[in-house]
């Protein structure tokens, strides 16, 4: 049985381009982001991959990325679940702020701690640990059972919500996961064993 799970971070958004903390705010993709999502779809198609089921967040940039990928695959009607549990980390009071302006206001070191520590949250927001605590139960209850049932599964989400999944799949620690970068629009192709551990992982090279 092929237990396929593909993870993809959304393409570049308007606020990525403007260097803003985005979190639960809802900007759409830039032209570059649209191109990244389409390239991801073409790359998956070139590998002969198709999907039985899809999951994405409640935010436009992830939903748009998924729609473009499925369009390139010629399968726009794949059953799709849109779930708030897969949303990006909530940056609280940082949301909508330019990252350089935030560094000027709070200091470079403090902003770095908020962005790259595991369990320290910005004012009014979530830590990465908080994000993991809402993403992983949803993965275990809804996504993983589909994969283990042999349904070819794609998840289009966000840098931090996907970090939570990669942390479990790759066996990373709370110390190492915050510094791991996920490129926009680049699929991670996993195949799982029946016990849910990873049999193989491929980062799909595009272009």
Curated annotation (Swiss-Prot):
GO terms for molecular function: phosphoglycerate mutase activity. It comes from the Bacteria. Keywords: Gluconeogenesis, Glycolysis, Isomerase. Pathway: Carbohydrate degradation; glycolysis; pyruvate from D-glyceraldehyde 3-phosphate: step 3/5. Pfam families: His_Phos_1. Homodimer. The active site is at residues 10, 88. Coiled coil: none annotated. Gene3D superfamilies: Phosphoglycerate mutase-like (3.40.50.1240). One of its GO terms (biological process) is glycolytic process. It catalyses: (2R)-2-phosphoglycerate = (2R)-3-phosphoglycerate. PROSITE patterns: PG_MUTASE. Substrate binds at residues 9-16, 22-23, 61, 88-91, 99, 115-116, 159-160. This is 2,3-bisphosphoglycerate-dependent phosphoglycerate mutase. Catalyzes the interconversion of 2-phosphoglycerate and 3-phosphoglycerate. The record marks 158 as: Transition state stabilizer.
